[in-house]
Each structure stands twice: as structure tokens, then as C-alpha cells.
Amino acid sequence: MTSPSPDQVIRQEILALSAYHVPPAKDMVKLDAMENPYRLPPFLCEEISRIAADTSINRYPDPHAAALKEVLSTTLSVPAGMEIMLGNGSDEIIQIIMLAAAKPEAKLLTIEPGFAMFKMIATFANMQYIGIPLKPDFSLDIDRMLAAIERHQPSVIFLAYPNNPSGNLFDTSALEKIIEISPGLVVIDEAYHPFAGKSFIGRLADYPNLLVMRTLSKLGLAGLRLGLLAGRPEWLSHLEKLRLPYNVNVITQLVATKIMQHYDVLQQQADAIRQTRTRLRTFLENLNGIEVFPSNANFILFRLDGASQIFRLLQQHGILVKNLDNSHPLLKNCLRVTVGTPEENDRFCNTLQDLIAGN
């Protein structure tokens, strides 16, 4: 009997994919992944150590993560009557939504450039992907969006608010129009809410087809891999059927519950990031030949000639940013830098300034 080859078994669209690439970052100033650069204070680290030591890791975690859900609902101001579903990061939640909605010929609609996982997971789920370009300034082309919704009748619309990789908030009235005319679900991804201050989570009761997604990764808990989805129980009760058992491990549940009881610590760190974002933006704006785009997130998108070469030179100097050049026509010659600590930002700024002067 002849052994089957991968191309005989695996779907062609999966064979055509490239695996998501995470560049090596050992011993680098890591400014590429929108992580919170600050560690937790010593008193919290000590409490976490005690929690880990006392945890029965030989037992499965609470399958419903009830204690964690309770503190998250309160801390994040989830409206009464709404429920939350937890995921092993937001990526799992995105995948659950798409798997649930992937009827034959079902379509996912989003904007471009946007979060790369929307398109990738649409392929996983075998959904048709529709990407609507933003305007050159990365604002929402609302007329084009509304026309696309009318034409394609998407089952699900995903919109990041603020957007990644551009960092800007879309016009609220435009998003309201999209939610109102959509024939299916609209999922607002608020991964960067701590740095933006605006949210649709308080509007969940206003729109029966609205879901709001959050993550704790950008707040400072990226290593725990915890995302959440807030919305009406009639939606979440069905999505829960696709959530794998025990998807949020016991350490994540207990540690996140403890940290969320000290949410003010994370808020103070987010405040510090917003302040250093302003200083970083001002520095970049004063460099010759750089176009800096407005940001309501914990990163800044900027454009300069020879971006890919600058990216490689920064790497050689031990600094890792995100190279977006050639990833989308609107991102030609664009790099994205995460807001780091003041020391990390200074090293990046001084190195970038020297590289530009050397060119």
C-alpha cells in the first residue's frame, strides 16, 4: 500500500499557507509585539509565587473559570445581562466565532490592513474572506464598507478598535452604521482599549448582533494567554459549544484572578505607556523624512524611505521592531514600533536617528 502524501490529505488552501512567523528575539530590545514592557511589582510577584506553589496542577482547572469570569465582568464593566466567554488568547475566540459561522459560502468581512489573524483563521475555518481597503490615511472608507456589506451579506464582520497595525480609532458613527446594517455578527476587537479610552462594551445592550472582544495580553499578561468575548447569552451559549474543555489552564485562572484584583497596577502601567507614547511620537515627528501616523494604541506606525533596510540595521543593533513594508500596498515603507520603557525607547530613538543620519 502506498503511503499518502500531505497534498493528498491536507486542504489545498492550507498547503498554500505559510506558518505565522515569530522572529527570534533573544537578547534583543523587543519592540515588535505590542507587549507591556513593565513587570509586575514585587508584592504581586510574591503572591503569584505562593499561588503557583499551592496549586494542584495534577487536577484539571475549573471548566467554567467562574471566579475569573466574575472578577473580569466587574473590572471591565461588562453590562448586566451580558455574559463572557474566555479563550486561550483572543486567537482562539476568533477561531471559535468563525467555526460557528462557517456555513457553506459564508463570508467574513473586515478591513485591510488589519489584524493578520482574521484572514488566516478565515482560511482555517473555510470561510470566504472579504478585505475592504482603508483610505490612505488609514481611516475607514465607510461608503465602500457599506456597499460591500450590502453586496456580500457577510455572516461575520471583524473590526479592531483601535486598529492594528495602524493604531487609530475609527469614527464611532461609522461603526454604528456598520453594526446597524450588518445581516450577521459584528465583532469589535478592543485589544488596545487600555491605551485608547473608548469602547463599545457599554453598547452591547443597544445592538443584538454586537460582540466585543478583549485581551489581557496588551495590559501586561501576554504570557498567560487570556482573551475574552462579551455579549448576549443567546450568542455565547452557542459559541461555548465549540470551546474546548479546560481551555484556560489552572495557573492562568488563578494568577489572572489575583492580578485583576489589583487592576489599578495595570492601569498605572497603561498610563505610563500612554505618556511615553506621546514622547516617542514627538521624537519621531521631529526626524527628517519620517511620516508618523496617529496612535491610540501601545505602538506607533511610521513610514520612511528604505524601511526594510532600516529594519535590518535596527536588528543588527539589537533592536527588533515590526517590518510591515510589502505586507500591504498601504503599508509600503512602514515600520511599527511598540512603546517600550523610557530606556528602551531612548535606545531605539538614538539608534534610528544615527541610522537615518548615516544614510
UniProtKB/Swiss-Prot annotation:
GO terms for biological process: L-histidine biosynthetic process. It is an enzyme of class 2 (transferase). The modification N6-(pyridoxal phosphate)lysine is found at K218. Its EC number is 2.6.1.9. Gene3D superfamilies: Aspartate Aminotransferase, domain 1 (3.90.1150.10), Type I PLP-dependent aspartate aminotransferase-like (Major domain) (3.40.640.10). The keyword Transferase applies. It holds the Pfam family Aminotran_1_2. Its cofactor is pyridoxal 5'-phosphate. Keywords: Amino-acid biosynthesis, Aminotransferase, Histidine biosynthesis, Pyridoxal phosphate, Transferase. GO terms for molecular function: histidinol-phosphate transaminase activity; pyridoxal phosphate binding. It catalyses: L-histidinol phosphate + 2-oxoglutarate = 3-(imidazol-4-yl)-2-oxopropyl phosphate + L-glutamate. Pathway: Amino-acid biosynthesis; L-histidine biosynthesis; L-histidine from 5-phospho-alpha-D-ribose 1-diphosphate: step 7/9. Homodimer. HAMAP family: HisC_aminotrans_2. Belongs to the class-II pyridoxal-phosphate-dependent aminotransferase family. Histidinol-phosphate aminotransferase subfamily. This is Histidinol-phosphate aminotransferase 1. It comes from Nitrosomonas europaea (strain ATCC 19718 / CIP 103999 / KCTC 2705 / NBRC 14298). The lineage of its organism: Bacteria, Pseudomonadati, Pseudomonadota, Betaproteobacteria, Nitrosomonadales.
